[in-house]
Every structure is written in C-alpha cells, then in structure tokens.
C-alpha cells in the first residue's frame, strides 16, 4: 500500500524550461522518418474550445489548493504572452483591477505525492578468487521506492456579463520515477510538480486559443509512369525539398504538363499549393490525387488540415471583427 507524503510549503515557480518543453510537445512538428523528403506546411488551427477562444479579455483568479497559486501565475503569464500573427490574443486584466473584462478563469489545484515500495533485481558477486575476481554471481532483490506524483487541477472560465460557463476541464497529469540504494532519484518532487504544471498550462493553451502550427509532411516518391529523364528530374525535385522547396514544386509543375495524372506529382503539387496557402488549389489537387490513390491516408490527413485551417481563419476573423467593434 502506498504512503502519501506531505510536501513542504516553500515557494516554487514553474520553470521556463518546463513550460517550453511542454509546449513543444503539445504543438510541435509532426514526426517523419529522418531520411524522408518533406515540405513544411504552416497555418492557423482552431482552439479545442471555440467558446473560450471567443473571449477577448479575462481575469485569472488566484486558484485554490496547495498548488493553485503557482498554476494561476503560470497561466496568467502564458495568456499575457500569447500572440497570434504577432498580436496579443487575450487582454489579461489584473484580478483586483477595476478595468472591464469579458470572463474570469478560476480553479483549484493540488499535487499528490505517493511512495510505494518496489523491488528490483541486481546481480551480486557472492564468490571471489584469490585475485579478488568475481567467479560467481547471483540475482538478488533490492528494495527501492517508486514515487508517483499526480496533478489533477480543475479549471473553469465563465463570462462576467451573464455567468455562462464557456470552458470547464479537469486535467490529469502524472509522473513516476523509481530510486534505489544504488540509484538516486532523477528529479526532486518540486521539479516534478513544476514540470506537471507546465504540462497543464500547455494543455490549457491549446484548449482556449488557436495555434499557429508547422507540420512536416512527407512528399510521395513513387515514379511509376515516368521515363528515365523524367525520373531523374523527379529525383532532383526530391533533393530540392530541403533547400529550395519552390524549385521542387516548379519541377513537379513541369512534369505535370508532360505526364498528367502521375499520382506522386499530383499529390506533391497539392502539397505545394497547401504550403503556399492556396487552399482552394490544394483541395482540387488532393481530390484528383484521391481518385488515383484512394487508400492514401496522407490525403485524408490533408483534407483534415485544410478544413481545420479554414475554420480557424473564419473564427479568428469573426472574433477580430467583433472585438474591433467593441473597442473604443
């Protein structure tokens, strides 16, 4: 049975490194094989909670609970620095200010620490020769400790004009490490809680505001239907994707005129259009590619990206128009 350990009350803040690492994991680049040829697509993607993302200004209340103060300060800092297209997304109002605000973000946060006894196997020398060389080993059990830290804050955002709740969530963050007499704990409880708070802040950021994201998308490389010269130029385009993506797209455009309907060329031109922001052209090309490659999952993913980007841009424009009309 685990033992709950009480933590000290000394001051602790969320480290910038912990928050930055959490944000990188939450909205980083898509993973592709290291050797794959790719193009990078950038665009605005919607918040998970459109109602919360529609808020223009808000107050971050000092949260309750042992770790509420640290979480609320971390959230306030993140929201104050959050920018879309180089402009602040939220106007953060101090808690005791008389300035008007659209909504208030409140919550409660407590981290719990639990230690559990565990055993690990170790090879131990039980017999040595006259030269002190081990000649016989045995597996023995050693007693260790598993430390589990859980952090499950509850958050709520409500509009101040009518009290309507526009965002509510209970987050669940967890970390565990094992230490033994021959291996020290890799990090302290305080550092662990700080990192979990950073993870929670990163989750909230994705919930309540759109994100400008970069995705690394693999191009298609099948050259079926191309002659020797065309295959050579196709390979040149693949090599150019890293240093000269527009040059790669120009090569594929020329090949499309010579061999209309070559599946890789059609898909890659769709990706080129998506990369430069011509989403209408990208959709036309992806639909053509889908008739040639009906089982290609990358095409379905592209439709999802484009749909999300269009929704995010529409929501952003609507919000900006509404907030512009309410500003003095």
Regions found by a protein language model. Name each.
Residues 101-183:
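Amphipathic beta-strand/beta-sheet edge segments enriched in Tyr/Trp
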Residues 18-30:
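Bacterial N-terminal signal peptides
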Residues 1-14:
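N-terminal secretory signal peptides that target proteins for export/translocation
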Residues 35-52, 145-150, 156, 160-261, ...:
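C-terminal/domain-edge helix-coil "capping" segments
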Residues 7-9, 18, 43-45:
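N-terminal regions of proteins, emphasizing targeting and processing segments when present
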Residues 47-118, 162, 167, 291-324:
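N-terminal segment of the mature soluble domain
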Residues 27, 75-86, 201-208:
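Hydrophobic, Leu/Ile/Phe/Ala-enriched alpha-helical segments that form helix-helix packing faces
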């Amino acid at each position: 049975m685990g033992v709950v350990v009480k933590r000290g009350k000394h001051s602790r803040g969320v480290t910038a490194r912990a928050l930055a690492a959490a944000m990188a994991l939450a909205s980083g680049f898509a993973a592709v094989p290291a050797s794959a040829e790719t193009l990078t697509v950038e665009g605005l993607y919607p918040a998970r909670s459109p109602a919360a993302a529609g808020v223009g200004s808000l107050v971050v209340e000092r949260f309750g609970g042992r770790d509420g103060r640290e979480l609320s300060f971390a959230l306030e800092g993140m929201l104050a620095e959050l920018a879309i297209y180089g402009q602040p997304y939220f106007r953060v109002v101090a808690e005791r200010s008389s300035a008007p605000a659209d909504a208030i973000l409140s919550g409660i946060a407590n981290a719990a620490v639990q230690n559990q006894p565990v055993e690990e196997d170790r090879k131990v020398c039980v017999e040595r020769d006259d030269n002190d060389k081990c000649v016989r080993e045995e597996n023995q059990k050693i007693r260790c400790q598993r430390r589990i830290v859980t952090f499950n804050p509850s958050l709520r955002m409500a509009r101040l004009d009518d009290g309507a709740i526009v965002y509510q969530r209970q987050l669940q963050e967890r970390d565990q490490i094992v230490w033994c007499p021959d291996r020290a704990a890799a990090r302290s409880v305080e550092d662990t809680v700080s990192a979990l708070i950073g993870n929670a802040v990163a989750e909230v950021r994705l919930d309540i505001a759109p994100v400008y994201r970069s995705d690394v998308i693999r191009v298609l490389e099948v050259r079926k239907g191309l002659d020797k010269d065309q295959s050579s130029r196709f390979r040149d385009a693949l090599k150019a994707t890293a240093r000269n993506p527009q040059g790669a797209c120009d090569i594929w455009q020329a090949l499309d005129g010579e061999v209309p309907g070559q599946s890789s060329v059609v898909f890659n031109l769709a990706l080129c259009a998506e990369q430069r922001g011509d989403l209408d052209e990208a959709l036309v090309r992806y639909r053509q590619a889908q008739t040639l490659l009906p089982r290609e999952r990358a095409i379905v993913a592209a439709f999802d990206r484009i749909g999300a980007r269009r929704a995010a841009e529409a929501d952003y424009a609507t919000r900006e128009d509404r907030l512009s009309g309410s500003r003095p």
